[in-house]
């Protein structure tokens, strides 16, 4: 997912 312009890979929950 992309959150605030930061890409999280292998995430379960991203904030």
Swiss-Prot record:
One BP annotation, GO: proteolysis
Noted pH dependence of activity: Optimum pH is 8.0.
Keywords linked to the UniProt accession: Antibiotic, Antimicrobial, Hydrolase, Protease, Secreted, Serine protease
Entry's localization field: Secreted
Tree of life domain: Bacteria
GO cellular component, one term: extracellular region
Secreted listed as a keyword: yes
Regulation of activity: Inhibited by PMSF and p-chloromercuribenzoate. Unaffected by EDTA.
Temperature dependence: Optimum temperature is 50-55 degrees Celsius. Retains 50% of its maximal activity after incubation at 52 degrees Celsius for 15 minutes.
Primary subcellular site in the record, as a coarse category: secreted
EC class name: hydrolase
Molecular functions (GO terms): serine-type peptidase activity
Entry's EC annotation: 3.4.21.-
Protein's job: Diaminopimelinoyl-alanine endopeptidase. Has antibacterial activity.
Assembly behavior: Monomer.
Name of the featured protein: Endopeptidase L4
């Amino acid at each position: 997912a992309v959150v605030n312009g930061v890409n999280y890979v292998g995430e379960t929950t991203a904030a």
